[in-house]
């Protein structure tokens, strides 16, 4: 599909969103995951820029009960009610409502392409909303391209994404981080990224872990200034 992704240890993909201050406040600093066509977001005929909060919103539960249904989850409402209306107030019209792929990923120990094909290309359910989380495939493709043949989980760290930890800008690396994708072989497990770099399906959704909102900029949003560094992020209007 026609897409562009930022990959490697620290690309110049910073963007200031939701603030006009001359120095972008940390809470308004995001990073561009990439530019994607309909295959990923479901909006026909549009290439959209997807961004993710640079720092964590906090540690949040994926759900408050043993269910991994995204549409009814606590996380979905945390992002699309609390975060969207409070933090992004006045900027909602600059965010595109898209189709998030919610059928998930049924197996671990595979490469980013295998993950992308299952959770994105062959998705069997979607949820229409403005805000979501990153997909495991987003995390996989954020590593330097030489690692794209590695598995996101293996028993040996030289064979999985622990080896790519220093060359993947999406790895937060403090504690585990939630993704939007579920394990459909279970009724209760979402996927998370471990702080050492592996992909896991080992946790209850009630665990409170790093949460970084992700969303797509509306196609009407235009570039204004900036070079994409953390101190001179892209500015949009």
Model-predicted segments: where are they?
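Collagenous Gly-X-Y triple-helix signature in extracellular proteins
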Residues: 1-237
